C-alpha cells in the first residue's frame, strides 16, 4: 500500500535506481509503521555536499555540508500565525515538507560506520521523516525518543547496522 506521495528529485544524477527505490520503500514502510495518513505528501531531494552546504548556510547559518536537512511545513516559525486548517472544507492532502540528503555525505558516513551506502540513505531518510513529524534531538530526552523510534522503524524494516 502506498501511504506517501513522494516527489523525488536526484540533483546528482548519479544515484542508482535501486538506491532510490530502497529509500522510497523505507519511507513507505515508515509511514505505515507510524500510522501516517494515506495520501500525505513530501519531497525528497538528493544533492551533493556543495548543494546541501549552500542550503545549510542560507537557512541554518552553518557554512558546512551535512548529511540531511528537513524543512517541516507544519512546524511554526518565529512570528508565524498558526492556521487551523480544520475550519476549512479542503480536500487537499497533508504536506509534511522537504527532506534533502547529501549522497556524498551518505557515502562518507557509510564508509566511516562500515555499512552500505543504501543503509545510510535509508537511515537518513527515516531521520528526515521523523523531523518532518516534529521529532528532534536537541535535548537528551528528545534524542532518546527520536533515536529510539528511528531504530525501531529501521529494525522493523530489517535495515540494521
Curated annotation (Swiss-Prot):
- Localization (cell): Cytoplasm
The UniProt keyword set, sorted, is: Cytoplasm, Endonuclease, Hydrolase, Metal-binding, Nuclease, Ribosome biogenesis, rRNA processing, Zinc
Q: Name one Pfam family in it.
A: YbeY
Give the UniProt entry's GO cellular component terms.
cytoplasm
Name the SUPFAM superfamilies for this protein: Metalloproteases ('zincins'), catalytic domain
Needed cofactors: Zn(2+)
> For Zn(2+), which residues are the binding ones?
127, 131, 137
The free-text cofactor remark is: Binds 1 zinc ion.
An example Gene Ontology biological process: rRNA processing
Q: Which GO molecular function entries does the Swiss-Prot or TrEMBL record give?
A: metalloendopeptidase activity; RNA endonuclease activity; zinc ion binding
Its signal peptide is none
Just give the chief location class: cytoplasm
Q: Any idea of its EC number?
A: 3.1.-.-
Q: What does this protein do?
A: Single strand-specific metallo-endoribonuclease involved in late-stage 70S ribosome quality control and in maturation of the 3' terminus of the 16S rRNA.
What is stated as this protein's family in its record? Belongs to the endoribonuclease YbeY family.
Question: Would you tell me the protein name for this molecule?
Answer: Endoribonuclease YbeY
Organism (species):
Listeria monocytogenes serovar 1/2a (strain ATCC BAA-679 / EGD-e)
- What is the gene called? ybeY
Amino acid at each position: 500500500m502506498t501511504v506517501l506521495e513522494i516527489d523525488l528529485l536526484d540533483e546528482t544524477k548519479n544515484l542508482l535506481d535501486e538506491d532510490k527505490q530502497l529509500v522510497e520503500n523505507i519511507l513507505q514502510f515508515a509511514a505505515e509503521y507510524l500510522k501516517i495518513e494515506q495520501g500525505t505528501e513530501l519531497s525528497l531531494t538528493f544533492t551533493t555536499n556543495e548543494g546541501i552546504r549552500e542550503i545549510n548556510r542560507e537557512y541554518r547559518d552553518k557554512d558546512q555540508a551535512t548529511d540531511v536537512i528537513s524543512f517541516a511545513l507544519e512546524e511554526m516559525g518565529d512570528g508565524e500565525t498558526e492556521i487551523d486548517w480544520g475550519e476549512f472544507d479542503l480536500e487537499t492532502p497533508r504536506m509534511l515538507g522537504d527532506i534533502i540528503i547529501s549522497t556524498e555525505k551518505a557515502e562518507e558516513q557509510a564508509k566511516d560506520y562500515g555499512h552500505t551506502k543504501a543503509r545510510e540513505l535509508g537511515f537518513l531518510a527515516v531521520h528526515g521523516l521523523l523531523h518532518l513529524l516534529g521529532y528532534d534531538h536537541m535535548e537528551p530526552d528528545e534524542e532518546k525518543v527520536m533515536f529510539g523510534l528511528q531504530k525501531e522503524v529501521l529494525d522493523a524494516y530489517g535495515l540494521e547496522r
